[in-house]
From Swiss-Prot:
Descriptive protein name: Ribosomal RNA large subunit methyltransferase H
Database matches in PANTHER family: METHYLTRANSFERASE, RIBOSOMAL RNA LARGE SUBUNIT METHYLTRANSFERASE H
Keyword Cell membrane: no
Classification via HAMAP family: 23SrRNA_methyltr_H (MF_00658)
Record GO terms (molecular function): rRNA (pseudouridine-N3-)-methyltransferase activity
Binding site for S-adenosyl-L-methionine: L76, G108, F127, S128, K129, M130, T131, F132
EC class name: transferase
Catalysis: reaction(s): pseudouridine(1915) in 23S rRNA + S-adenosyl-L-methionine = N(3)-methylpseudouridine(1915) in 23S rRNA + S-adenosyl-L-homocysteine + H(+)
Gene that this polypeptide is encoded by: rlmH
Subunit architecture: Homodimer.
InterPro entries: Alpha/beta_knot_MTases (IPR029028), RlmH-like (IPR003742), tRNA_m1G_MTases_N (IPR029026)
């Protein structure tokens, strides 16, 4: 299985980079992982709704450059469907069983994901109704993917 994470913004803090490296190493037993960072746009203070949409569209165009036709695209979005870890494990496993072995998870910037990306998405997933920093969320996603593979394989970890 090939898993691509396309995220807006770069990780700058060493502790976040270390966590990403650790989960990337752990996941190498289960899948080929590719993490792509696209440049984020600066959001001016008090940006209007239309300015925010323009920023999301610019970031969205950068993301689209990395999405192939054969990818099953999962957009991480507050309006998406929620599921628990075991359900997420089945979701990823079933994608692989149905021949969808190239999965792309999209993490938007601080303003969210563009409408163009949401239209392209095959599935919209919500981890929580809470908002998280997108840099931290990348680690949360990696951990859930790792947890999902452990559950799939019947290996201890998830309790």
């Amino acid at each position: 299985m090939n898993i691509t994470i396309i995220a807006v913004g770069k990780l700058k803090e060493k502790y976040l980079k270390a966590a990403v490296e650790e989960y990337s190493k752990r996941l190498s037993r289960y899948c080929r992982l590719n993490i792509i960072e696209v440049q984020d746009e600066k959001t001016p203070d008090n940006a209007s709704s239309s300015e925010q949409d323009i920023i999301k569209e610019k970031e969205g165009r950068r993301i689209l450059k990395y999405i192939n036709d054969n990818m099953y695209v999962v957009a991480l979005d507050l309006k998406g469907s929620m599921m628990g870890s075991e359900e997420f494990s089945k979701f990823v496993g079933n994608l692989g069983l149905s021949g969808k072995s190239n999965i792309a998870f999209i993490i938007g910037g601080s303003l969210g994901i563009s409408s163009e990306i949401l239209k392209r998405a095959d599935y919209k997933l919500c981890f929580s109704k809470m908002t998280f920093p997108h840099q931290l969320f990348r680690i949360m996603l990696l951990e859930q993917i790792y947890r999902g593979f452990r559950i799939m394989k019947g290996e201890p970890y998830h309790k």
